[in-house]
Amino acid sequence: MTIQIIVLITAVISVYALSSRPALEKMMLNPYQVVHHKQYWRVITHGFIHGDYLHLFFNMYVLWEFGRPIFTIFTNQVAFTQVMDGDDWWGSHLGQNLFLMMYLGAIFVASVPALIKHRNNPGYNSLGASGAVSAVVLIFVLLFPTSTLYLFFAIPIPAFLAGILFFVYESYMNKRGGTGVAHDAHLFGALYGLLFMAMIAPSSITGFVGKLMAMIN
């Protein structure tokens, strides 16, 4: 249910913001406004608005496709549900709470590069859920490294290779610059996703290696 709610809320807020320029400007990530005018809400709200409908559709489609299997693991793993007392609200909803923490945390972490680099630039703005979606994609790669993904919707490659290509491409484009895309936000979001999993489920790292070794052998 959590993913459906995230998609619905993001779609509603994005459509509203696209129809109201003042609302869009109020919710965008503007590091200058965050740092100098304490408009801290922007580090989260920017992840729920998009520049156009294609941007919105692509991010929510990727979140839906990659997020569902992750959410299933979060909600079904005994290791997660036994972390806290199942009788209290947090414990009984631990899986969905972890997913929500991961997603919101990724939105915030993805904003960090811009906050550092553009804190004195009042003209810089950023928006979109791409940083959080990058976290979701890389967690999928970590949990299902040997599953098949389709590059450009046509070329079948294993998920772990897609993960490698992601980091190579985003790193190159971030260094190149001039694209108008916050590639550093994608990188920070993806790295956060991997770190999040390493913290809540260290076995996911060894499991990743084990699955790769099994595939090679």
Regions from the PLM with identified roles:
Residues 1-217:
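A detector for small-residue-rich transmembrane helices and their helix-helix packing motifs
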